[in-house]
Amino acid sequence: MTDSTYDVPRVRTYLQGLQTRIADALGALDGTPLATDVWQRGPEERLRGGGCTRILEGGRVFERAGIGFSDVAGDALPPSASAARPQLAGRGFEALGVSLVLHPRNPYCPTVHMNVRMLIATKPGEAPIFWFGGGMDLTPVYPFEDDARHFHQVCKDALDPFGAELYPRFKTWCDEYFFLKHRNETRGIGGIFFDDFSEPGFERSFEMMQSVGDAFLNAYLPIVERRAALPYGERERDFQAYRRGRYVEFNLVFDRGTLFGLQSGGRTESILMSMPPVANWRYNWQPEPGSPEARLSEFLVPRDWV
């Protein structure tokens, strides 16, 4: 969409505040404040700009929790950003967003991912093109139906004020996007995903993105609070590491955000903070039929949760 009325400083201020709010809440829950790593790229580099990474490793609740804010610009959109919109190939761009991945220590607590972002594509002599993207999705190891219903209900409640059609549309998009084709399974129980969103204009699109970002803590923290104290042993940790391998596979093979960052010359440490701290692979391993581990497969297909 072409529109010269967008307001990058307002978006930037919101995103920086969102990162701080989430980092403070996670630090309070874990009992360990998240460290702060501010970074900057020079004007001579392929990707210019900077950002702030909030990171916790080895915490009581979170084995790794990373929340990144970045505001970067480049001379040409990378292929991962223009593949679906070839008319944007070669345009300069600015991309700003917040992205997080949380890997809890307890296998009964699900991993979660959330991202909200804005991109502007520019070309001399033409009006800029902007769009919003983002979403959130839940990846349990030992799933609970109550958790899935709660997570999806909060996502739906965040979107409904902007149109009843958005939740089913973004929910389906999430199921299709977070799918491991080579494994024929979804990454988790889904959530919402959207990209190239600008139809209602800047103000309404920005409000919708804020609603998604603001909903995250309510979607996720009650689940962690319910599950973080459940007892577990070596068996559960082994299965958690095995399932984390699927997370690695998706992020390195399919994830457009990872590819965008690496293709555009982004900051590798920030891009790969989504990786789990421990993961493993086993040759042709299958869970015992009827076991809690086997039950996970029932959840790794698209389902209507609300």
Curated annotation (Swiss-Prot):
Organism, as annotated: Burkholderia ambifaria (strain MC40-6)
Enzyme class: oxidoreductase
Keywords per UniProt: Cytoplasm, Heme biosynthesis, Metal-binding, Oxidoreductase, Porphyrin biosynthesis
Obligatory cofactor(s): a divalent metal cation
UniProt subunit comment: Homodimer.
A GO term from the CC aspect: cytoplasm
Protein name per UniProt: Oxygen-dependent coproporphyrinogen-III oxidase
Gene3D superfamilies: Coproporphyrinogen III oxidase, aerobic
The organism's taxonomic lineage, starting at the top: Bacteria, Pseudomonadati, Pseudomonadota, Betaproteobacteria, Burkholderiales
Function: Involved in the heme biosynthesis. Catalyzes the aerobic oxidative decarboxylation of propionate groups of rings A and B of coproporphyrinogen-III to yield the vinyl groups in protoporphyrinogen-IX.
Family per record: Belongs to the aerobic coproporphyrinogen-III oxidase family.
Catalytic site positions: 113
Entry-linked InterPro entries: Coprogen_oxidase_aer, Coprogen_oxidase_aer_sf, Coprogen_oxidase_CS
GO biological processes: protoporphyrinogen IX biosynthetic process
Amino acids binding substrate: 99, 115-117, 265-267
First-listed, main subcellular location of the protein, grouped into a coarse class: cytoplasm
GO molecular function list: coproporphyrinogen oxidase activity; metal ion binding; protein homodimerization activity
Site (Important for dimerization): 182
Compartments where located: Cytoplasm
Top-rank taxon, per record: Bacteria
Positions bound to a divalent metal cation: 103, 113, 152, 182
Region named Important for dimerization: 247-282
Catalytic reaction(s) noted: coproporphyrinogen III + O2 + 2 H(+) = protoporphyrinogen IX + 2 CO2 + 2 H2O
Pathways per UniProt: Porphyrin-containing compound metabolism; protoporphyrin-IX biosynthesis; protoporphyrinogen-IX from coproporphyrinogen-III (O2 route): step 1/1
EC number: 1.3.3.3
